Amino acid sequence: MPNTMQALHTRPLNENLITKSLTAADYVATLDAMLSRTLERISLKKEQGLRTPDELWIVDHNDVYTLGQAGKEEHILQRTNTPIIKTDRGGQVTWHGHGQLVMYWLFDLDSISWSVRNMVSHAEQAIEDVVNDCLKSTASTDTNHISARARRDAPGVYLYADMATETDSAPTSDEIEVDNTIMIGKIASLGFKIKHGFSYHGIAINLDCDLSAFNAINPCGYAGMQMLRLADFVNMNQATNIQPNNLPLTDDKKTLTYEQFTQQLIDNIAQRHAGDIPLRELAPK
């Protein structure tokens, strides 16, 4: 029986960007739909000169392991009942499932004057912005020394602890980087595919997923990479509870909802897409 996909719920953000939402999504059906839509947009641009709105797909996947173009079978450490799908995105092996926010970027890069490097940096910095805002909003002594950062040597977003505020004793030189922080793990992954200047695939942020699924693989090809989720650093609740006008969390309301995080990230990406948030200097090596 062929894989089928539910209808996507569509919402326009502006004339050049729309969102589409999908829950309990089958990976193969979603990939087929992304590729089909991308090829359709390429054809419309080449044959008719039409610029179609870019699309940000907000997806909640059923459990699946995916092998990117650089993926190696040896990075799958255990065989489970979870499907393993070979795909055409960049990167190696990862897991998708419930409690993880996946956003697919179906963008015409030429129309927004982005290079592939620009897109990757915008993706990482958007995640940094929103995760750091959420970490700060908790005002917790357990998380006020934690920050989200990208790395030049390994795509994605990672959490770092500021050792200077965590302990009075001086850490040894082999424990930390020169800026007095230590990486504690990875919270977000990314992998894109570019076809004739159009992107698809995208980013995945661990919000309140079951991290044990990562134990069966070397995430993104890195043996022993510690995967993290936001729910272990802030109070999260999946119940819909978006505050009016998407206001930041206040001191007396420290519970973050899945929907709040999603909306903040959509807003940040939309502003970057419109040119309203410039890129910062790239992360140090």
From Swiss-Prot:
The keyword Iron-sulfur does not apply. CDD domains: LipB. GO terms for molecular function: lipoyl(octanoyl) transferase activity. InterPro entries: aa-tRNA-synth_II/BPL/LPL, BPL_LPL_catalytic, Octanoyltransferase, Octanoyltransferase_CS. It catalyses: octanoyl-[ACP] + L-lysyl-[protein] = N(6)-octanoyl-L-lysyl-[protein] + holo-[ACP] + H(+). Gene3D superfamilies: Bira Bifunctional Protein, Domain 2. GO terms for cellular component: cytoplasm. It is an enzyme of class 2 (transferase). The record marks K186 as: Lowers pKa of active site Cys. Residues 50-277 form the BPL/LPL catalytic domain. In the reaction, the free carboxyl group of octanoic acid is attached via an amide linkage to the epsilon-amino group of a specific lysine residue of lipoyl domains of lipoate-dependent enzymes. Belongs to the LipB family. Catalyzes the transfer of endogenously produced octanoic acid from octanoyl-acyl-carrier-protein onto the lipoyl domains of lipoate-dependent enzymes. Lipoyl-ACP can also act as a substrate although octanoyl-ACP is likely to be the physiological substrate. This is Octanoyltransferase. The gene is lipB.
